[in-house]
Amino acid sequence: MTNNDPFDELGQNEPQVRKALTQVPGVDAQDAVVEWLSGGGAHKNFLVTASGRRIVLKLWNTMWEGVGVISPAPVVMQNTILAGQIGIGAPVLAVVSDPLALALEFLPDCTPLEPTGDRWIPRLASAAKTLHESGARFHNDYNAFAEARKMFAAARQRGAELPENFEQLCREVAKVEHTLDLRVNDFVPCHNDLYGPNVLETPTGQLRLIDYDLSGNGDRCYDLGFAATYFEMDLDSINRFCEAYFAEHNPHLVARTRLFAVACNWATVALWCVAMTMADTNDDYDYRGERTNSLRRLHANLSATDLGAQLRDASR
């Protein structure tokens, strides 16, 4: 049985989906009900109901590796497996090589975290810390500044539309990178994409972090800065977020978190610039709108009246 979506992503990909399902243990591919899952910006995601269970199947889109957006598939898949074993991500049921796909346990009755009330900030801090303090080691390191350079290089090569005043932005971001002075010895396993759809709330109130395409070992304050900017936290909220995470009010760590929001928005601008040149993207995802939002947040970060104080306080 097939449920078609308006953009016919399922219609185009159904043969590959069912071929992959034949390689997932305990799944009857022939009788499976397959639905398109909208909202993903990288791979083709499907919800499968079969043999009394529900799973998520991700058909891998390897084109993103070729332009420096995500790490090679084996790295991302192993990171996803680790996150599931930690208990913060969704458990992986199978890795399929032909077609390249990942089958994950469906997390039932989960909804994206609502940034309302008093408890969502400390709960998000706790979820991030669960990953960071897990003792796991992902299979790659992640530096958003270096990743942005790779993606902008790919974007230039592909004739992408770059932001206005690009060279000036490069110089301003370079000052932030110099101040933050990333050091590999400080790195912990990081999600690196902590925005609404990737932070799910279970019926019991637990938070789960899904989608490890951008994951890697990195500076924990990058995850905090990413969440702070994507959840549009004001300064008071960022202070509460950092205090919940670090169990203290520390102006140095708050400043680092705020400056890592610059890194986040710069890297995502680069990502969306590349994405807008790609042929096999998902029709229901607004890549241009995401680029506009990343640029808006980046300009807000760099025009903050206390940017100089942030740079001073964040220095090692």
Model-derived regions: residue spans:
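Active-site acidic catalytic loop and adjacent metal/ATP-binding pocket
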Residues: 35-57, 177-222, 236
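A cross-family kinase active-site recognition segment
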Residues: 110-171, 178-188, 214-218, 285-289, ...
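ATP-binding pocket architecture of kinase catalytic cores
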Residues: 35-143, 160
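Active-site activation/catalytic loop segments of kinase-like enzymes and analogous catalytic loops
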Residues: 221-252, 263-282, 293-297
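Short secondary-structure junctions
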Residues: 23-31, 85-88, 180-184
